[in-house]
């Protein structure tokens, strides 16, 4: 049971949400009085309450989603709130739906989407993983951050071949190393206001670090937003190489580290937007002609469930005709399907760019 103190904080938080007429988050949309009363007294075995779930969305009324999961159990204990949010965000993934088993598929069906190097500047595929038996950021203790780091570091440093590289802990990092990692665009900073409010930055920088291979085409973020963010990337459009590298790396890490997976929601992550495959496959691509007609660009992208952003992030424009284009769907389909849909869509966009006037 949540303590009386937590429940009274929750009552105040609920009132604040109700009075915020300019708040349009999914949290506000689905945290009805009925759902609130049903959940306000609950607490997970690891000590998480509804307050941990909603605090970021209450503090940041301009949130799009507004909720995070403090631990794996939260997705089931607070399902009355999470389920409708997940269904809304993941376009109809109903409480009765299930994430298919993990399936990376036949890597030989992937190709270099731009062999002439005319359009695609770079390609990147990432996934998130949580370690089984540990809560997510808001409920982690300092010692747990250190434990997770040491388990993962050992496994990463045993990698061989093209994955071989070095682990750089954020704690005690020298200025030179810091500068190099910033120049490579590898260094992550302490979380933004949404993550701060969700208490995702506790004991910073304890237990946080970055691993990258010598060729700088493979990267792992340890204890940033998720326990692990595993990233494969390179210049050009060779999706087969990029995805293949990610699949190999996940397999190596999995030999020693058990990941948190739910039968219905797939791989569990701190933010419900990343659930399921957790995969974001993206390219930076030059589409000057198509970009001049944004409506047409969005139309082709939507047909393949692709998200179009400027390269500076979510809400940025693209004055130079370069876009960050990625798969929108992560939940309710296999890893293979998510990446294949992105490949098909990119090929179609290149075709449309070539035929644009």
From Swiss-Prot:
Q: Which residues bind substrate?
A: 64-68, 225, 271, 314
Please list the GO terms describing molecular function: arginine kinase activity; ATP binding; creatine kinase activity
List, for all copies, the residue spans of the domain called Phosphagen kinase N-terminal.
Answer: 9-91
Which CDD domains does this chain map to? arginine_kinase_like
Signal sequence interval, chain numbering: none
Taking every annotated instance into account, which residue ranges of this chain make up the domain Phosphagen kinase C-terminal? 119-356
The residues listed in the UniProt record as binding ATP, with positions renumbered to this chain, are: 122-126, 185, 229, 280-284, 309-314
- Give the reactions, separated by semicolons, that this protein catalyses: L-arginine + ATP = N(omega)-phospho-L-arginine + ADP + H(+)
Q: Which PROSITE patterns match?
A: PHOSPHAGEN_KINASE (PS00112), PHOSPHAGEN_KINASE_C (PS51510), PHOSPHAGEN_KINASE_N (PS51509)
Enzyme class name: transferase
Q: Fetch the InterPro entries from UniProt.
A: ATP-guanido_PTrfase, ATP-guanido_PTrfase_AS, ATP-guanido_PTrfase_cat, ATP-guanido_PTrfase_N, ATP-guanido_PTrfase_N_sf, Gln_synth/guanido_kin_cat_dom
Its cofactor is:
a divalent metal cation
Return any one Pfam family short name: ATP-gua_PtransN
EC nos: 2.7.3.3
Keyword field: ATP-binding, Kinase, Nucleotide-binding, Transferase
| Keyword match Nucleotide-binding | yes
GO terms under biological process:
phosphocreatine biosynthetic process
Q: Which domain of life is it from?
A: Eukaryota
Q: Name one GO cellular component term.
A: extracellular space
The similarity annotation says: Belongs to the ATP:guanido phosphotransferase family.
Record-given protein name: Arginine kinase
Write down the species: Trypanosoma cruzi
């Amino acid at each position: 049971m949540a303590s009386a103190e937590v429940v009274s904080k929750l009552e105040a938080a609920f009132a604040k949400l109700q009075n915020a007429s300019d708040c349009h988050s999914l949290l506000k949309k689905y945290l009805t009085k009925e759902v609130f009363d049903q959940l306000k007294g609950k607490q997970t075995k690891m000590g998480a309450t509804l307050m941990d779930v909603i605090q970021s969305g209450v503090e940041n009324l301009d949130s799009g989603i507004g909720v995070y999961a403090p631990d794996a159990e939260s997705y089931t204990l607070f399902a009355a709130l999470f389920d409708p949010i997940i269904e809304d965000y993941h376009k109809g993934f109903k409480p009765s739906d299930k994430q298919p088993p993990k399936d990376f598929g036949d890597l030989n069906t992937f190709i270099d989407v731009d062999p002439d190097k005319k359009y695609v500047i770079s390609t990147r595929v990432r996934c998130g993983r949580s370690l089984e038996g540990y809560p997510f950021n808001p409920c982690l203790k300092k010692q747990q951050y250190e434990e997770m780091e040491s388990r993962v570091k050992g496994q990463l440093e045993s990698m061989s071949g093209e994955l071989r590289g070095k682990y750089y802990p954020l704690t005690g990092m020298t200025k030179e190393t810091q500068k190099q990692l910033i120049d490579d665009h590898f260094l992550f900073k302490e979380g933004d206001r949404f993550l701060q409010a969700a208490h995702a930055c506790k004991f910073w920088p304890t237990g946080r670090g970055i691993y990258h291979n010598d060729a700088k085409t493979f990267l792992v973020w340890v204890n940033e937003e998720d326990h692990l963010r595993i990233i494969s990337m390179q210049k050009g459009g060779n999706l087969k190489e990029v995805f293949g590298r990610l699949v190999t790396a996940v397999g190596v890490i999995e030999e020693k580290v058990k990941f948190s997976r739910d039968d219905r929601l797939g791989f569990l992550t701190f933010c419900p937007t990343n659930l399921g495959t957790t995969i974001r496959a993206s390219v930076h691509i030059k589409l000057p002609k198509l970009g001049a007609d944004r409506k047409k660009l969005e139309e082709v992208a939507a047909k393949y469930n692709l998200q179009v952003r400027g390269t500076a992030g979510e809400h940025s424009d693209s004055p130079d005709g370069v876009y960050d284009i990625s798969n929108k769907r992560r939940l309710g389909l296999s890893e293979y399907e998510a990446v294949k849909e992105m490949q098909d869509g990119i090929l179609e966009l290149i075709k449309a760019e070539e035929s644009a006037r």
